[in-house]
């Protein structure tokens, strides 16, 4: 397989999995077993494609918030997005400096996929018993910020899975409202994470030698695919539960745990 086709597939995979509650990190690690490992810079660029995708998909919502800051409800919402991001940034930086992060290898990812699938089923079951609410409380904002840190510590957890369900359990029980808030918080979080990673790479000596055609193709693929996925998901969850994603995670996690010993042998 050519490097260009490999880059295209990885870009599509990033766009498909970044916003679904199935872990983009886990899927990229799995894909790299067959498509080859790419540089950290390549992975940052395809995540930038996902960032652009969600900004485009939510452009009307972002514009509405930006132009409606005169309304108290909009100011309150934006402030809570900011607080959730700050919690992630501060606690995440402390965790990173302390080295509290599992290695991005297949075994912890497999366990995270499996356990995360169970968590999704249990969380949605209990959240479904709550009265439907679409108001973001301060408790939800802080918890979402902390849940993003947890997702960073445990590769394969999925940022969207950990945050959407903690928001639902803590009172933001309407699925579409929980997803909307989580995606809004994800925009500054992903921007900051990518910027921090680029800064660290620069300090360590630059970005190395890249095939810019591969990088460009992967970026465009991640952007287009991510845009389609976000639009589809926001429509899907208005009428459906997350059960299919939970079952998929459990099956994939179990399959990986069964495959790993055979691959090692």
From Swiss-Prot:
Is Translocase found in the keyword set?
no
Location of this chain's protein in the cell: Cell inner membrane
The protein's matches in InterPro entries, at most eight in alphabetical order, are given as: UppP
Q: What keywords tag this UniProt record? A: Antibiotic resistance, Cell inner membrane, Cell membrane, Cell shape, Cell wall biogenesis/degradation, Hydrolase, Membrane, Peptidoglycan synthesis, Transmembrane, Transmembrane helix
Q: Please classify the protein's predominant subcellular localization into one broad category.
A: membrane
Q: How does this chain sit within the bilayer? A: Multi-pass membrane protein
Which reaction equation describes what this protein catalyses? di-trans,octa-cis-undecaprenyl diphosphate + H2O = di-trans,octa-cis-undecaprenyl phosphate + phosphate + H(+)
Name any GO cellular component annotation: plasma membrane
**What further note is attached to this protein's record?**
Bacitracin is thought to be involved in the inhibition of peptidoglycan synthesis by sequestering undecaprenyl diphosphate, thereby reducing the pool of lipid carrier available.
What is the protein's given name? Undecaprenyl-diphosphatase
User: Highest lineage ranks of the organism?
Assistant: Bacteria, Pseudomonadati, Pseudomonadota, Gammaproteobacteria, Lysobacterales
């Amino acid at each position: 397989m050519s490097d260009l086709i490999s880059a295209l597939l990885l870009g599509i995979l990033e766009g498909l999995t970044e916003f679904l509650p199935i872990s983009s990190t886990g899927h990229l690690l799995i894909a790299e077993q067959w498509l080859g490992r790419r540089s950290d810079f390549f992975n940052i660029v395809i995540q930038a494609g996902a960032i652009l995708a969600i900004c485009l998909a939510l452009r009307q919502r972002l514009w509405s918030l930006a132009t409606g800051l005169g309304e108290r409800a909009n100011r309150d919402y934006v402030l809570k997005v900011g607080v959730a991001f700050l919690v992630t940034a501060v606690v995440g930086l402390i965790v990173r400096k302390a080295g509290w992060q599992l290695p991005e290898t297949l075994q912890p990812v497999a366990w995270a996929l499996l356990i995360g699938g169970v968590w999704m089923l249990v969380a949605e079951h209990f959240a479904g018993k709550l009265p439907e609410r679409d108001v973001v409380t301060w408790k939800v904002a802080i918890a979402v910020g902390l849940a993003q840190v947890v997702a960073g510590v445990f590769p394969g957890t999925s940022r969207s899975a950990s945050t959407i369900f903690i928001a639902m359990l803590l009172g933001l029980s309407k699925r579409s409202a929980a997803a909307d808030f989580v995606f809004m918080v994800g925009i500054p979080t992903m921007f900051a994470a990518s910027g921090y990673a680029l800064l660290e790479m620069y300090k360590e000596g630059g970005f190395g030698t890249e095939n810019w055609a591969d990088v460009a193709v992967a970026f465009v693929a991640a952007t287009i695919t991510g845009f389609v996925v976000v639009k589809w998901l926001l429509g899907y969850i208005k009428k459906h539960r997350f059960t299919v994603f939970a079952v998929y995670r459990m099956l994939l996690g179990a399959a990986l745990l069964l495959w790993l010993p055979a691959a090692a042998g």
